[in-house]
């Protein structure tokens, strides 16, 4: 599913009327109907008074721009259907948008109940409140008067226990970055138009938007955007398109030969987790190369399906490998940095770089903060070290070191920086965070939509590295392996989360990978 930014939404509003001859007024009418359909999808609107006052109604809290006008259209359609609805207005009606002026007159002609917010006091009869104070164009800070109104709505919600909906995005949420202004409320639902807005998938925005319901725009906006939309959700639909059913004649040679390089005296478990995950994701053969000093103890702990060798056997280390994954628990000595450099030069096959292998790279690029702040993306990132085509799987701290930028800056420009890094270096970047994202060399970014808080424990990233390597060994492209790996890894954790909120281990996630693969293949068949 596509993901839209603020700029994408503006582009649609501007270009759909130009290119397709579908006016903004028609798009607004469709949006209003979409709100109504979303409400019907969650409630029996003819039974609003069940457990409530006999005079219960749906309240639309509308600003005087086009976001509020969407709410006016929805209120009008509900009234036409016989569902009680009332409208309260926020802002100066004398400064309203042209389409708002059209819609408010239509509501008046239908006899809709319309009050200014300060005059409204019938909160005890509100069954559902729908907020349309401002839309996707918001950025920065909320005005004090808006904060006061939102605080008042929240107080009334606590007192009278009604659900709160947002139109397109909650007031105070930046639709692109996911950052929320002071005073932003937490909503039960957000009905958003055409496609989900990026800010609803990025924290803290994801925490305030509630359940997102995507309402169709009633226009083929995708053909207008064309290649402009490069941000896509990672979900079951996408994973089902990627995964392939195995031929009955498949054998271990067909399913690939994976090499995991990692481990040190202090980090024995990390490479074991990666190697076992490669096995559980379906790799035909998995070899784990560790320093000779820990080889014996690793052999005693790893599952028997994993072959163990020494990193000192350089000559045969890369023979017949479909993929080499390097980094889990590897260590940060000068010798390790030399080893990583040697492998980058000597090995020409598929590579997955994680953890200490990323540390060994040092700074590979730098960010111009002023350009980034000003939105001059083309000038924001400069390459300092060339990299081979590979999959890189840093968490935020590791990514911070790679691009020499504080984490707070990365969080603020999460998707932009990932996209520019992958484009500049021509690599596949799996940036592990909340949410994890996969950025491709062509500028496409995939945003993970699943996973849970139980994944916040040491070793989860090692498992992901093994999963991605395992899929590469089976013949999936690096791109598909990264996307599929992120999905399968998170979905495995979600299955465990059904019985354990947290406390499950990375090893549990690894051993549950087959359940997810079966789930996907069941749909595939």
What is the predicted function of each stretch?
Residues 1-90, 97, 189, 200-355, ...:
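Small-residue (G/A/S/T)-rich helix-start motifs and N-terminal tracts that mark the onset
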Residues 73-156, 296-309, 315-316:
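N-terminal small/polar loop signature for handling phosphorylated ligands or for N-terminal nucleophile
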Residues 93, 135-140, 174, 180, ...:
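Short strand->helix junction
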Residues 127-128, 133-229:
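Internal gly/pro-rich beta-alpha loop/helix module
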């Amino acid at each position: 599913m596509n993901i839209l930014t603020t700029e994408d939404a503006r582009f649609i509003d501007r270009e759909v009327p130009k290119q397709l001859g579908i006016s903004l007024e028609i798009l607004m009418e469709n949006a209003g109907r979409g709100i109504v359909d979303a409400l019907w999808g969650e409630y029996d609107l003819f039974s609003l008074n069940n457990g409530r006052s006999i005079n219960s109604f749906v309240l639309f809290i509308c600003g005087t721009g086009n976001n509020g006008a969407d709410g006016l259209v929805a209120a009008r359609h509900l009234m036409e259907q016989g569902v009680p609805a009332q409208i309260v207005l926020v802002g100066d009606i004398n400064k309203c948008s042209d389409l708002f002026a059209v819609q408010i007159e239509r509501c008046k002609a239908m006899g809709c109940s319309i009050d200014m917010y300060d005059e409204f006091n019938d909160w005890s009869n509100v069954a559902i409140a729908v907020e349309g104070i401002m839309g996707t164009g918001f950025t920065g800070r909320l005005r004090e008067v808006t904060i006061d109104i939102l605080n008042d709505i929240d107080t009334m919600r606590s007192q009278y226990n009604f659900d709160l909906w947002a139109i397109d995005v909650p007031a105070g949420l930046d639709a692109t970055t996911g950052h929320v202004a002071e005073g932003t409320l937490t909503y039960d639902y957000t009905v958003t138009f055409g496609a989900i807005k990026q800010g609803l998938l990025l924290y803290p925005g994801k925490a305030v938007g509630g359940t997102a319901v995507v309402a169709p725009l009633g226009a083929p906006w995708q053909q207008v955007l064309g290649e402009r939309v490069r941000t896509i959700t990672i979900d079951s639909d996408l994973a089902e398109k990627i995964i392939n059913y195995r031929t009955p004649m498949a054998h271990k040679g067909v399913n690939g030969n994976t090499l995991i390089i990692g481990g040190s005296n202090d980090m024995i478990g990390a490479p074991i987790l990666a190697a076992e995950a490669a096995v559980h994701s379906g790799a035909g053969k998995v070899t784990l190369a560790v320093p000779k000093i820990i080889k014996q103890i690793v052999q005693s702990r790893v599952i028997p399906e994993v072959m163990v060798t020494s990193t000192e056997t350089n000559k045969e280390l890369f023979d017949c490998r479909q993929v080499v994954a390097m980094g889990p628990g590897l260590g940060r000595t000068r010798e390790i940095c030399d080893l990583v450099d040697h492998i980058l030069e000597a090995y020409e096959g598929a590579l997955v770089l994680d953890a200490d292998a990323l540390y060994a790279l040092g700074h590979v690029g730098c960010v111009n903060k002023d350009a980034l702040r000003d939105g001059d993306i083309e000038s924001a990132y400069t390459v300092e070290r060339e990299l081979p085509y590979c999959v890189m799987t840093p968490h935020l701290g590791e990514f911070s070191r790679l691009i020499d930028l504080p984490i707070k800056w990365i969080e603020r420009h999460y998707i932009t920086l990932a996209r520019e890094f992958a484009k500049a270096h021509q690599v596949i970047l799996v940036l592990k965070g909340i949410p994890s994202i996969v950025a491709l060399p062509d500028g496409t970014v995939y945003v993970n939509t699943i996973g849970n808080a139980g994944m916040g424990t040491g070793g989860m990233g090692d498992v992901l590295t093994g999963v991605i390597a395992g899929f590469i060994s089976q013949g999936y492209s690096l791109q598909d392996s990264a996307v599929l790996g992120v999905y399968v890894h998170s979905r495995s954790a979600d299955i465990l989360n059904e019985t354990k909120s947290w406390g499950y281990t990375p090893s549990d996630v690894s051993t549950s990978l087959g359940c997810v693969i079966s789930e996907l293949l069941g749909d595939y068949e």
